[in-house]
Amino acid sequence: MSKNIYCVFLRKQAEGQDFQSYPGELGKHIFNNISKEAWAKWQQKQTMLINENKLNLISNTDRNFLEKEMIKFLFKS
C-alpha cells in the first residue's frame, strides 16, 4: 500500500510511489517528494526526449542530459 506524500511537482497531497524508481540520493529525494502521477508524467516526457533527441542511453553524455532534464521537469516547474 502506498503512502500519501506532498508532491512538489503537483503541489498537493498525492499517492507516493511504491518503490524508489531512481538510484542514489536523487532517487531517495524523488521517492519522498514525487508522486506516482508526477512520475508517470515524467516517464512520458522522458520517452519524448529520448525519441526526439535520438538519445543513446549507453552514452554518459545522454544519460547526464536526461538526468538534468528530469530534475528541471520534476523540481523546477
Swiss-Prot record:
GO terms for cellular component: cytosol. One of its GO terms (molecular function) is iron ion binding. Transmembrane segments: none annotated. The keyword Iron applies. It comes from the Bacteria. One of its GO terms (biological process) is cellular response to oxidative stress. The keyword Transmembrane does not apply. Gene3D superfamilies: Fe(II) trafficking protein YggX (1.10.3880.10). Keywords: Iron. Pfam families: Iron_traffic. HAMAP family: Fe_traffic_YggX. NCBIfam families: PRK05408.1. Belongs to the Fe(2+)-trafficking protein family. Could be a mediator in iron transactions between iron acquisition and iron-requiring processes, such as synthesis and/or repair of Fe-S clusters in biosynthetic enzymes. This is Probable Fe(2+)-trafficking protein.
